[in-house]
């Protein structure tokens, strides 16, 4: 046989199913004869749901990945990851094709009775080092510690006293501060080690070391700038090393210079 197009359909289909997904597509675009099989072959790579949701032959994709923020989850999903801020429950989710599930330990503890034993579970682990510093809208500093220390997911501060010069390292007064974690448990709040405390409350810029994401612009505190920690975390405050100054919202006025000009913490002052 001189022309492969003259093969029977089932033979061509069998050949295509032996190819990688990329080769299948390239093969189909050779001519209209092969393009006919686009909705007949199976695709074996993992695809994001939002990229193929409007494809009429979505059932031909063997692995479909989806990041769920709510419990409205498509039934065709095979690889599911629950967002750390996931809202809802897996109780009423119909996921007959689900084979892999990635979630946090707390989420697993909450939903494990609704998870089929056949589903492969991947529980997210907390890293044991400073992961990255996000200097976007919220000025979040995300840190992590090992199991012997407090698990600080996010130190959130409001920047209300920007300097006149918007260029260079940012400095000013950090108005409020609160610690939260997606892995929350009262037992986690034990103490912050000296290295973490220095990263959070030090006078100098946060060093870009042991990170997997470069710092666009380091935060540099002025001599009158202190990071304040909400007094509801008294058990943390009591264990901060003595050489690290501790300030609560009640005594902030004592450290604010009299000539300080307060401005609205709008977006334009955060850049």
From Swiss-Prot:
Q: Where is this region: Disordered?
A: 251-271
Q: Which residues form the F-box domain?
A: 4-49
What InterPro entries does this protein map onto? Answer: F-box_dom (IPR001810)
**What residue ranges carry the coiled-coil annotation?**
none
Biased composition (Basic residues) is annotated at 260-271
Q: Name one Pfam family in it.
A: F-box
Q: What is this protein called?
A: Putative F-box protein L165
Its source organism is: Acanthamoeba polyphaga mimivirus
